[in-house]
Amino acid sequence: MAGLGLALAGCGVQAQQPLPGGAATAGQDGLGARARARGIGFGTAVQGALLASDPAYAAAVMLEAQLLVPEFEAKWDALQPREGEFDFAPLDMVIDFARARRKQLRGHALVWHQAMPPWLPEALAEGPARARRVLEAHLDKVLGTTRGVISDWDVVNEPLANPSGSRFAALTPARGIFRETPWLRALGPDYIELALRLARQRDATLRLTINDYGLEADTPWAEQKRQAMLSLVRRLQAARCPLDAVGLQAHLQMDEPFRPEPLAKFIGTLRSLGLAVLITELDVREGRSLPAGLAARDVLVAGYVEAVVGTALAAGCRTVLCWGLSDRHSWLLRDPDVARRDDQQHRGHPLDMAFRRKPMWQALARAFAGR
């Protein structure tokens, strides 16, 4: 791949090796165990309904992941579909699964411009006092209920604007470095600081994270967004606002070039500011043109992943989460904004449709081993 900055042929990526019987089985070391042996946390986004209904899905999660994040169940529309009426039953499915199997949990996401129930934008439009009351009530209930169970939250998700030139810029209005959202309109840029302070007041044990995408590639707009994130972090720190970590979503796009140096420098700067750095939503969208055959495609995906994750780990990142383990239930297939428009499907996860390990699995294992 032009511009990758690393020779994929030298990454040690091999063609797919299906495991006996197809899916991964309990006698084999999963990615979570391999990562943990090196002081790294590895996990995945999960869906509670699938954990309960799909035995192969649940088995893969049990084997491969040590850290789980609810894909949908902790978002605002799931937890508070009507004002003042909370529903924790879907989230409890994930919590119960994790507790029974001694998995750690992180939460996603307390403040976001998507996954809003219909009443929420209307309430925020009533003004800053109403917006603050709504936010306080939500954090009171959610953090009070999950205290001691979820120790790490994406408190604010995707606050930054997409810089001019990026493929998403036209879709996302901006106000300076910030994405224009109902939260920004109601409370101004200080909504970020407010959310972090309120979260810390409600649970002093939490790791408070700001999470965003488009921070990994070697493009002018990714560099602009990296600088915007650093500007936001410094602004918060100057205000003595609590912040513990920055999440890099790492929804990687293979049409974008990658070079290790810009990402390593960015992570190093965040670490020098006293923050942890996490990869929170790793998956891969393949390029517009595809090589013939799944094996060749999977090798390219694996090489890109190994380059990015290896760079991040070497720079001090110690947590890696995939946004799903398997291609079978991937948002890359069901979301029209990211699904392929040809007759192909993205193969951007460590396991295939039958939960067999792909070269991306091997690439992650190698990155965790530091090879």
What are these model-predicted stretches?
Residues 1-18:
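N-terminal export signals
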Residues 21-64, 71:
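Boundary/entry segment of secreted carbohydrate-active catalytic domains
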Residues 43-47, 154-155, 195-223, 278-281, ...:
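Aromatic-lined carbohydrate-recognition surfaces of secreted/lumenal glycan-active proteins
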Residues 67-81, 90-215, 286:
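Substrate-binding cleft and catalytic face of glycoside hydrolase catalytic domains
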